[in-house]
Amino acid sequence: MNTCLIGLSVDSNASHLAWLYDIYCKTGIRVPFPIIADRNGEIARKYGMISSDVSTTETVRNVFIIDDKGIVRLILVYPMNVGRCIPEILRALTALQIADSNEASTPANWVPCQPVILPPPQTFAELELRRKEIEKRQNGMTWYLSFKTPNNCEKCIEDK
């Protein structure tokens, strides 16, 4: 998926080490990603993880997908009493990557390798071409809602 997982917390490095060690001692699992100690909250504030007008540094349980240009593409906000859903995070990441590489959108409840939604035509000539394509391939409901199989469908199967 060509993606890096990074933890970020305003806790100290010593606190992170104690947490990682505790996880390892109790479960035998080594956390396989780095955790950044953002003691002054600079990174957390930049991405809106901590409000700039609030002095508290209470932890938030959010997942941010940030692209290689530093743009936040997706934020999943979890209440403190709800665990994260890793399959949904991976599905959302795959959806972003597939949509970007196909210049398309993924519909509600999309799962990898299902058809994606083509962007609507921008001219009347494109509309006529799209309508004919739908009639020929039966790949849409109307000129503004048509689908295609993602170009890199094999990749999303390999990444599972």
Task: Mark where each language-model region is.
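Chalcogenol-based redox active-site neighborhoods
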Residues: 1-160
